[in-house]
Amino acid sequence: MSIFVELKSKLDQAITGVNRYNPNNVETLESCIEAMVQENQYDKDILVTTLKLYQLNPDKYNESVVKLILLKTMMMAPKSDYALAKYLIDSSRVGSPELKRIFDIGALLESCNFAVFWRLMRGDYRPLDDVNEPFRQPGEIPKIIKAVPGFEESVRNYACQVINVTFQNIEKSLLVRLLGGVSDKQVNEYARYYGWIPKENGEVYFVQNHEATIKSRNIEEKLQFDILFSLIAENV
């Protein structure tokens, strides 16, 4: 039995009912999260419970664990786990340099800026001479990402899901760039998994005909709290 599975089985009983936010659970939760990262596992409930306990018990706050939680939830994109994790961190904590670096990575992925992400990972990124430049020390980003097993693969799968809803056809050269310079074999594996059809001797992939798959749906607007606040303030 893996360390994560063993700790999770203990926590499944320990964080139920009124005992969920018992501060005595923090140490076990942190150990479980560290095992979760190293074994490339995932449990949203454990991550969210830990952040809530940090809110309720500021003396227990552990920034190193919060960084791991943010990175693990980021790996679930396009699900909203990362957004939830961000909003469970007290505003007095979010300005720390270490968390800001994580948030800058998250902002790249939330905006689907895969090209910059992979340039950072390859060491090709050159920071701008600008006060707003988020990656003044680009060499730190690969160290953060490579310490989390499966992160790069999760970004590739996220990119594939974005491609699925964005492109009808995509050139192979662009596809390779969006997936971080993968090999021809890997491109074929992703194409097979997502049902993309090679055309023009494999230089273009047909993704899907979006016009033929349009469905009526209810659209739920998701506004960030700061945007919502500014909208309300303007109308007061």
Swiss-Prot record:
Q: Does the keyword Cytoplasm apply?
A: yes
Under the heading Gene3D superfamilies, the entry gives:
ARM repeat, domain 1, Winged helix-like DNA-binding domain superfamily/Winged helix DNA-binding domain
UniProt GO MF annotations:
ribosome binding; RNA binding; translation initiation factor activity
Query: GO CC terms for this protein?
Result: eukaryotic 43S preinitiation complex; eukaryotic 48S preinitiation complex; eukaryotic translation initiation factor 3 complex
Q: Which GO terms describe its biological process?
A: formation of cytoplasmic translation initiation complex; regulation of translational initiation
Q: Describe the location of the PCI domain by residue ranges.
A: 42-222
- Biological role stated in the UniProt entry: Component of the eukaryotic translation initiation factor 3 (eIF-3) complex, which is involved in protein synthesis of a specialized repertoire of mRNAs and, together with other initiation factors, stimulates binding of mRNA and methionyl-tRNAi to the 40S ribosome. The eIF-3 complex specifically targets and initiates translation of a subset of mRNAs involved in cell proliferation.
The similarity comment for this entry is:
Belongs to the eIF-3 subunit K family.
HAMAP family with a match to the protein in the record: eIF3k
State the protein's name.
Eukaryotic translation initiation factor 3 subunit K
Q: Which organism is it from?
A: Brugia malayi
